[in-house]
Amino acid sequence: MGNTLTCCVSPNASPKLGRRAGSAELYCASDIYEAVSGDAVAVAPAVVEPAELDFGEGEGHHLQHISDREMPEDLALESNPSDHPRASTIFLSKSQTDVREKRKSNHLNHVSPGQLTKKYSSCSTIFLDDSTVSQPNLRTTVKCVTLAIYYHIKNRDANRSLDIFDERSHPLTREKVPEEYFKHDPEHKFIYRFVRTLFSAAQLTAECAIVTLVYLERLLTYAEIDICPTNWKRIVLGAILLASKVWDDQAVWNVDYCQILKDITVEDMNEMERHFLELLQFNINVPASVYAKYYFDLRSLADDNNLNFLFAPLSKERAQNLEAISRLCEDKDLCRAAMRRSFSADNFIGIQRSKAILS
C-alpha cells in the first residue's frame, strides 16, 4: 500500500531453504532495489509463483559451499581414518599381515630375538625418549612415515591410478626411466632416502611428516586410487607440498621444490597441487585427535618393526620440566572450569598460575 513495496515468494523460500535458493533471493532483491532507486513510485511486482522458484533442475543456480566440500556426503566419515579419530589407520592394518607372518616365521624357525635392545623402566629408573606428540623426533618420524608408505605400496589392493600422478606421463627426471623400474615395489630405504632429501632441503618439521601421511591416506580414500610403483613419488611429493604449506609456519613456494628436483617445472607442480586439492575436495583440515592417533599408530608401527626410539634415563631436571608443564595444563583446566561459574573478583585473583620451563 502507498509507497510500501513488497515481494512475495513461496513459503519455502526462506533462509533455511539452502544455498541453492541464495541466487534467486538475490535476484528478487535486486529487482526491488532497482524499483525503489528512482523518485517515481513503482508498481509492486506480482506474486512470484512457486513454479518460478524451482531450484531442483536449474543448472546455473547451484553453488557448492566450502563446508560441503570439506565434509563430502558420499563418504562414510566414521570409517575414514583421516577424518574420524576412532577409525583405524590404513597403514597400521596393512602392516599387521607382515608382522604376523614375521612372528610366525620366527616361531617356526626357533629364531632367537638375540640381545634385547629395548630398555624397560623399573622402580628406580625410568626410560623416556625425546619424542612427544607435540614435538616428535624428526629422524624417527620420517622413518616411520616412509615405512607406512612402504606397506601401502606392498600390500595395495590394486593398481588404480590417475594420469597426473603417473611418473611415466609426468617424469621427475629428464633421464628416461626403464619400464622394468615400475614393475617392482620400492624398498623402504629408497622411499626414506627420497623423503629425507625433501625434508632436509626444505627444512620441514616432524609434524609435517605426520600431516603428509594424513593427506596421503585421505587422497587414497577420497579418489579411490592405490599407491604403486608408478605413482608413489608424485603422490608423496604432492602430500609433502600441501602439508608444508598448511602446517609449517613459513612461506613455501612451488619453485623451492623445483630447485630441489631440478628437472621438474613449476607448471607441473602447480597442476599437481591443483589436482591434489580437488581430489581432497579441499578438505585440508587435520583435527588434533586425528593427528594424535596417527602419531601413536606410527609409534606402534615402529615397535612392531623394531624401529625403536632413542631412550634415555629420566633426569631430575627433565622431571622438573615435565612436572611444571603438567601443572600448567592442570591450572588451565581449573581456570576454564572456574570461568563457567559466577564468583567474586577475590576468588578470581586467588587462582595461581605456574611458570612452565620449556626444554
From Swiss-Prot:
Pfam families: Cyclin_N. Its main location: membrane. The modification Phosphoserine is found at residues 67, 105, 112, 344. Coiled coil: none annotated. The keyword Cell membrane applies. Interacts with CDK16; this interaction mutually increases the stability of CDK16 and CCNYL1 and increases the kinase activity of CDK16. Key regulator of Wnt signaling implicated in various biological processes including male fertility, embryonic neurogenesis and cortex development. Activates the cyclin-dependent kinase CDK16, and promotes sperm maturation. This is Cyclin-Y-like protein 1. It comes from Homo sapiens.
